[in-house]
Amino acid sequence: MIPNPLEELTLEQLRSQRTSMKWRAHPADVLPLWVAEMDVKLPPTVADALRRAIDDGDTGYPYGTEYAEAVREFACQRWQWHDLEVSRTAIVPDVMLGIVEVLRLITDRGDPVIVNSPVYAPFYAFVSHDGRRVIPAPLRGDGRIDLDALQEAFSSARASSGSSGNVAYLLCNPHNPTGSVHTADELRGIAERAQRFGVRVVSDEIHAPLIPSGARFTPYLSVPGAENAFALMSASKAWNLGGLKAALAIAGREAAADLARMPEEVGHGPSHLGVIAHTAAFRTGGNWLDALLRGLDHNRTLLGALVDEHLPGVQYRWPQGTYLAWLDCRELGFDDAASDEMTEGLAVVSDLSGPARWFLDHARVALSSGHVFGIGGAGHVRINFATSRAILIEAVSRMSRSLLERR
């Protein structure tokens, strides 16, 4: 059995070896549990594929369909999704840039794009920077999609769509930051409403492989009524390949003609080494992923116990998927930047306010500030638990001591 990948690196190794954003954006005394990057070594089969490419000088431009074929094989095996056709895919630089390119195919400047707040901050930034209007459809209090609020947003967006008549909905499946894994029934409810109101759905499924025990991922394109939708996938989150740029845009059967209109130059953006790494991850990284999922399952249980014992007043929402947990710190009484009126321009994912600012300044623990995730985010923090048990325990211990000193 492959050992837990989360326990292979010490804090000292991470601080000395890592030069990425997670470990360099803050001083060395800060424990960084903010950006979605895992504290793991590169999966061995992925490292081997990259070494072969470098040794062979295979460092040119990407070409071919192996990435899409690997995703199709993975989807068949893991999710029993058998109708992903390679001919309805396109390689894009990464998931967010792919989302922008897909939205350009189905919307015009000024058109509405609906999101479920609180949600991944770049949803606001990338959409608004490209001239589209963000319309929030807030989640329910339990962190799940509110189908009534979504229907109201669809109706409102349809009424305000202007002469183009274009409306898009950007779905986060699984949801970041809450870790909710949408059920097949929820996705069918989305598809039915999208059909009724003429809304095109674009599903960000970058966290799809990261579902530990207890939940099941359903690809949005696999549900009835999603034939004119799109999905974006990559191996970057599940195998820690964020710096090796490549992702896959996938069209439903009725959206294939739209995807075919994507400009050819978009395919120049992905890295050839990125394509090699992502292909290897989906095709040969399954055993490593299973070991990671076991480690994440242990860590989310540990984090829940640590919060219950050491952080009174903080509510821990059990994440069904991803390696991100959403902590409700509103009972702690911190002043926080108001997010309820913000629907655009939340571009700075490192912006800090309220509890996240406190924990950085007084506990030397870097978390993501809830207000940047939009409506419903103020008073919350997002914590990345894809690290060692020792680092997780130390981080919560520091947070606890800082709150005791505040009293």
Curated annotation (Swiss-Prot):
It comes from Mycobacterium tuberculosis (strain ATCC 25618 / H37Rv). Its EC number is 4.4.1.13. Its cofactor is pyridoxal 5'-phosphate. One of its GO terms (molecular function) is cysteine-S-conjugate beta-lyase activity. Pathway: Amino-acid biosynthesis; L-methionine biosynthesis via de novo pathway; L-homocysteine from L-cystathionine: step 1/1. This is Putative cystathionine beta-lyase. It catalyses: L,L-cystathionine + H2O = L-homocysteine + pyruvate + NH4(+); an S-substituted L-cysteine + H2O = a thiol + pyruvate + NH4(+). One of its GO terms (cellular component) is plasma membrane. Signal peptide: none annotated. The modification N6-(pyridoxal phosphate)lysine is found at K237. Belongs to the class-II pyridoxal-phosphate-dependent aminotransferase family. MalY/PatB cystathionine beta-lyase subfamily. One of its GO terms (biological process) is methionine biosynthetic process. InterPro entries: Aminotransferase_I/II_large (IPR004839), Class-II_PLP-Dep_Aminotrans (IPR051798), PyrdxlP-dep_Trfase (IPR015424), PyrdxlP-dep_Trfase_major (IPR015421), PyrdxlP-dep_Trfase_small (IPR015422). Keywords: Amino-acid biosynthesis, Lyase, Methionine biosynthesis, Pyridoxal phosphate. Pfam families: Aminotran_1_2. CDD domains: AAT_like (cd00609).
